[in-house]
Swiss-Prot record:
It comes from Escherichia coli O1:K1 / APEC. It comes from the Bacteria. The keyword DNA-binding applies. GO terms for molecular function: ATP binding; DNA binding; zinc ion binding. Its cofactor is Zn(2+). This is Transcriptional repressor NrdR.
Length: 149
């Protein structure tokens, strides 16, 4: 790695430690030319598939969009932010595990519903009512009945 102080090409690693529950590596480096020390962080770059929307428009996966949709459904519900983050990470892992370069938005919606069903049934119904475009109270009742099975 190039030295950020003198831009020399050669640096050496003095110390490496796992941080963030093993999800990244913190390295202390020293420049072999000017002897300045600096810290770098190394994380795996996990490429998310692109999202194919129902109108065939393709867009990059947007974690913030996923999070805001879930938080909207979970508003004023007794679910911790840690549980929400775990659910988001689970969805992202499932999307990466497909091995596909593109995934339909419908798949993401179904994965969100699956996670919300585990987290909070009311949030699940809220999300499903918008996602599936419930037209009347009968459709709500049918979905609630399916939850009770």
């Amino acid at each position: 790695m190039h030295c950020p102080f003198c831009f020399a090409v050669d640096t050496k690693v003095i110390d490496s430690r796992l941080v963030g529950e093993g999800s990244s590596v913190r390295r202390r480096r020293q420049c072999l030319v000017c002897n300045e020390r600096f810290t770098t962080f190394e994380v795996a770059e996990l490429v998310m598939p692109r999202v194919v929307k129902s109108n065939d428009v393709r867009e990059p996966f947007n974690e913030e969009k996923l999070r805001s949709g879930m938080l909207r459904a979970l508003e004023k519900r007794p679910v911790s932010s840690d549980d929400v983050e775990m659910a988001i990470n689970h969805i992202k892992s499932q999307l990466r595990a497909t091995g596909e370069r593109e995934v339909p938005s419908k798949m993401i919606g179904n994965l969100v519903m699956e996670q919300l069903k585990k987290l909070d049934k009311v949030a699940y119904i809220r999300f499903a009512s918008v996602y599936r475009s419930f037209e009347d109270i009968k459709e709500f009742g049918e979905e609630i009945a399916r939850l009770e099975d």
